[in-house]
Amino acid sequence: MFLQSRVSRLLAQLRAAGQLLGAPRPWPGPSPGATRTRSSACGPPASLSAHHPRARTSAGVGAWGAAAVGRRAGVRTWAPLAMAAKVDLSTSTDWKEAKSFLKGLSDKQREEHYFCRDFVRLKKIPTWKETAKGVTVKVEEPKYKKDKQLNEKISLFRGDITKLEVDAIVNAANSSLLGGGGVDGCIHRAAGPLLTDECRTLQNCETGKAKITCGYRLPAKYVIHTVGPIAHGEPSASQAAELRSCYLSSLDLLLEHRLRSAAFPCISTGVFGYPNEAAAEVVLTALREWLEQHKDKVDRLIICVFLEKDENIYRERLPHYFPVA
């Protein structure tokens, strides 16, 4: 009888702590074996999914409080009560709450939500200054002067852009912003359904313009979506201007949101048909001229290519725009 009475008092203390701090009880009802109810006085509504951000966050805060009271009472509290809040970005139905949740996490905490484990940190991506040591292209008359600082701000990387842990990756999108083929589809699949949900609110995007969203399950914090020109064959002057605008509009958003690193894919060179060599000239001119004005506001701009063909083009052309010797 004495033991049963002591257990009852301790359980009552835990229930009181959960009600004060909004914690769901470790059992569904007021006491084991009694009539069960679905929610506590201050907890989240019963209609909320267990994966819903509000439900998880409320549970996490309340559980911490219940655990603290349990320690003061000399009780070993139930392990699930002390678990941290977590949102499932694959199933949550509210992109706004998921976005707010992610913004409150540290970089280390965000890693738990990445779609991949083999992500690439920025510090692992060599700068052009380092890469150029292995480039044998000789440039008699470079288009621009040598600038050591700029050579440390630009990188050429061949690989999967969705795995780069940078502030933002740029998406070569179509005007609907709802996903498509190529890199666009890869980014949407990796980020998860919440990216498409947020993109639906942006109401399309014009050619040469850019819009920004959360990165969700990506290692990148943000995705900047831009729409390149469709140019099958020799591009016109207006199409070249639109391609340049894609990069500059994306960089404007980078500054606006105080982001310091970004990775760009090859925009318009896939199904949009822009010639790879001609695109590289536009891209390198835009990046060089932009960096000359804003080099202190960013840490790194990465040209991320997937095809060996594009890697060879940029390794050949970069010394003309970012000479190292």
Swiss-Prot record:
Protein name according to UniProt: ADP-ribose glycohydrolase MACROD1
Which is a Pfam family this sequence falls into? Macro
Keyword annotations from UniProtKB, A to Z: Acetylation, Hydrolase, Isopeptide bond, Nucleus, Ubl conjugation
What does the record give under GO molecular function?
ADP-ribosylglutamate hydrolase activity; hydrolase activity, acting on glycosyl bonds; O-acetyl-ADP-ribose deacetylase activity
Reactions performed catalytically: 3''-O-acetyl-ADP-D-ribose + H2O = ADP-D-ribose + acetate + H(+); 2''-O-acetyl-ADP-D-ribose + H2O = ADP-D-ribose + acetate + H(+); 4-O-(ADP-D-ribosyl)-L-aspartyl-[protein] + H2O = L-aspartyl-[protein] + ADP-D-ribose + H(+); 5-O-(ADP-D-ribosyl)-L-glutamyl-[protein] + H2O = L-glutamyl-[protein] + ADP-D-ribose + H(+)
* Activation and inhibition: Subject to competitive inhibition by the product ADP-ribose.
Q: Name one GO cellular component term.
A: nucleoplasm
User: What does the subunit comment say?
Assistant: Interacts with ESR1; Interacts in a manner that is estrogen independent but is enhanced by estrogen. Interacts (via macro domain) with AR.
Described function:
Removes ADP-ribose from aspartate and glutamate residues in proteins bearing a single ADP-ribose moiety. Inactive towards proteins bearing poly-ADP-ribose. Deacetylates O-acetyl-ADP ribose, a signaling molecule generated by the deacetylation of acetylated lysine residues in histones and other proteins. Plays a role in estrogen signaling. Binds to androgen receptor (AR) and amplifies the transactivation function of AR in response to androgen.
The record's section on PROSITE patterns has:
MACRO
Residue(s) carrying N6-succinyllysine: K96, K103, K129
Family the UniProt entry places it in: Belongs to the MacroD-type family. MacroD1/2-like subfamily.
Instruction: Report the SS bond pairs.
Output: none
Q: Which organism is it from?
A: Bos taurus
SMART domains per the UniProt record, alphabetical: A1pp
Q: Which gene encodes it?
A: MACROD1
Domain Macro residues, every copy: 141-322
Q: Where does substrate bind?
A: 159-161, 172-174, 179-184, 267-273, 306
Q: State the residue spans of region: Disordered.
A: 21-55
Q: Subcellular localization, per the record?
A: Nucleus
Give me any GO biological process, just one.
Answer: DNA damage response
Position(s), cross-link Glycyl lysine isopeptide (Lys-Gly) (interchain with G-Cter in SUMO2): K138
**Primary location:** nucleus
Modification sites for N6-acetyllysine = K163
EC number(s) on file: 3.1.1.106, 3.2.2.-
